[in-house]
Design a protein with these regions (language model features):
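A short, basic N-terminal segment
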Residues: 1-12
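Conserved RecA-like P-loop NTPase ATPase core
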Residues: 26, 73, 84, 130, ...
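Phosphate-binding/switch region of NTP-binding enzymes
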Residues: 33-34, 39, 44, 71-74, ...
Length: 334
């Protein structure tokens, strides 16, 4: 079959700036891969991102709060009613903005026209497919580049047409000693098609803390690694940025140091007894901690604010409970 030759002059191409849903981790209109070993917190991390985006709250390293967005979330591993919705609610997501394509009569795959239909109908700015291998389609060998490449090319084209950021969640293979680029499950074409690749892992010294490290960024300088914690009592908590590398994450080695953790330790020391909000703010400035990081540390520790006379005081939650019992007539303000 003969195809008419058509040439495009680069002179006629109108340049465009890359648009970001979360700079520099999640570009609009492009594919992003989030990968890690099973049980390391990939889905938990993505659900936390969804929670912030649906509420219009800034993510780590973002200076301004974005407008709330709709999200399409497809999962083949977890139940919607008993797992995904409870986790979204625990993360504080606006569940009215999280939409799922009904697969009860026909399963989805990346070549399914319903994906783009859903994006156009809802105006969703993010689509998540978890895990990627479940959406390749029947008979597709994820290790064969000639089978994977055309599927990813179509998915990337859909993302570009709609301007939607697409996250593909995947597992790592079990091979040790390989470069991070070759630890992804399946063909290397998955990595090649993605403009951003994020790796999630935990540290051996503190298994409750997970690290998200950017392993690839084709559109901007690679972002800082981000720490988060899965706390049995307080749930998901962002713990700030750090200098740990992808290799540190994959090996579980390295010492975690972030401004958020530093401020949490300082607050626990300062607030053995209640301290004025002014004193806390001054101490944060001395340590070079931003007000936003300070507020994150305050939220993570559950610190309460009480007004005594004309001054505001900060105290740890257990101190706040005692204080309210003793001075019930003073108002409690957040």
């Amino acid at each position: 079959m003969n195809t008419e030759l058509k040439l495009i002059s680069m002179r006629d191409i109108q340049t465009e700036d890359v648009q970001w849903l979360w700079y520099p981790y999640l570009p609009r209109g492009k594919l992003t891969i989030v990968q890690g070993d099973p049980g390391e917190g990939k889905t938990t991390f993505v659900l936390a991102v969804i929670s912030a985006l649906t509420r219009g709250e800034p993510l780590p390293e973002c200076e301004q709060a974005p407008e709330p967005v709709n999200v399409i979330y497809q999962t083949a591993e977890d139940g919607l009613a008993d797992t995904i919705k409870p986790r979204l609610e625990a993360a504080g997501a606006d569940c009215a903005r999280v939409l799922v394509i009904d697969e009860s009569k026909r399963e989805l795959n990346l070549s399914d026209e319903r994906l783009e239909q859903a994006l156009r109908k809802t105006g969703a700015q993010l689509m998540v497919l978890d895990p990627i291998q479940a959406y390749l389609g029947d008979g597709v060998d994820m290790h064969r580049a000639n089978e994977v490449r055309p599927i990813l090319k179509r998915t990337a084209a859909m993302a570009e047409r709609t301007g939607c950021a697409v996250i593909l969640i995947g597992h790592m293979n079990k091979a040790q000693g390989l470069k991070s680029g070759y630890r992804g499950l399946g063909s290397i074409d998955f990595r090649a098609a993605a403009r951003s690749v994020l790796v999630v892992g935990r540290l051996k010294d503190d298994p409750a803390v997970r690290i998200v490290a950017q392993d690839k960024n084709s559109l901007a300088p690679e972002g800082k690694s981000i720490a988060f914690q899965l706390d049995g009592e307080r749930g998901f908590k962002w713990k700030g940025t750090c200098d740990l590398s992808v290799d540190d994450v994959l090996s579980g080695s390295g010492k975690l140091q972030t401004k958020t953790l530093q401020m949490e330790e300082e607050l626990e020391r300062m607030l053995r007894e209640a301290a004025t909000a002014e004193a806390v703010l001054n101490r944060a400035k001395e340590l070079g901690v931003s007000e936003r990081t300070l507020m994150t540390a305050k939220k993570n520790l559950g610190i309460v604010s009480e007004k005594r006379g004309s001054q505001w005081y900060w105290m740890l939650p257990e101190q706040g409970d005692v204080y309210k019992r003793q001075h019930w007539h003073w108002p409690c303000c957040g």
